[in-house]
């Protein structure tokens, strides 16, 4: 039943409205209900599977990008896990016009730097959702910043990105913990690059 509701909503709403006004609140609601014990584990898994299927179909529809658009690498550091939120950020970025290289979750920091230089990315987006290992992740983010080309920007996303506020001034790293702010930052960077 959720599949049908999601499909109908996708057909009616624009991609950004669907993600920001409909899907993100739905994911938050599911997480809240699970944490309160009002939803069974199996129900949560089935709901998230429907949402992931919906996001994958959106991702496939938006995959074609122009040859000359700005490039972005998105992934997460070691000990991080994939989140539906990360997939929503990917779709928002594609909708703005970025060419995305998604390298997945649990990627060593030097491999993220290598991927960014290989595709000549203008932006690296790191998803941080796991509250553990903050000191190690700060070291790894600093390493990525130091090895990045001068033209590369870095944006931290995810539920735990606020824990890294001290990096914003020290290393010129942006933090975006909501989809609307992320979209606005991408649009601004896109206009500066083009």
What would you call each of these model-derived segments?
Residues 1-63:
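Long amphipathic alpha-helical segments
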Residues 37-40, 46-194:
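C-terminal regulatory/effector modules of DNA-binding transcriptional regulators
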């Amino acid at each position: 039943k959720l599949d049908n509701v999601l499909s109908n909503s996708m057909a009616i709403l624009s991609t950004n409205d669907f993600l920001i006004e409909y899907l993100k609140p739905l994911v938050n609601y599911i997480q809240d209900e699970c944490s309160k014990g009002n939803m069974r584990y199996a129900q949560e898994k089935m709901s998230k599977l429907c949402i992931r299927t919906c996001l994958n179909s959106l991702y496939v529809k938006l995959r074609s990008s122009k040859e000359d658009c700005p490039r972005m690498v998105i992934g997460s550091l070691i000990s991080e896990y994939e989140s539906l939120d990360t997939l929503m950020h990917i779709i928002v970025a594609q909708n703005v016009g970025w060419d995305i290289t998604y390298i997945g979750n649990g990627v060593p920091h030097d491999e993220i730097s290598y991927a960014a230089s290989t595709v000549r990315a203008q932006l690296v987006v790191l998803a941080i959702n796991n509250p553990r290992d903050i000191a190690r992740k700060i070291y790894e983010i600093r390493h990525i910043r130091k090895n990045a080309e001068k033209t590369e920007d870095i944006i931290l996303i995810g539920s735990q990105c606020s824990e890294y506020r001290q990096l914003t001034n020290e290393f010129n790293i942006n933090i975006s913990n909501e989809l609307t702010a992320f979209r606005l930052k991408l649009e601004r960077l896109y206009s500066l690059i083009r």
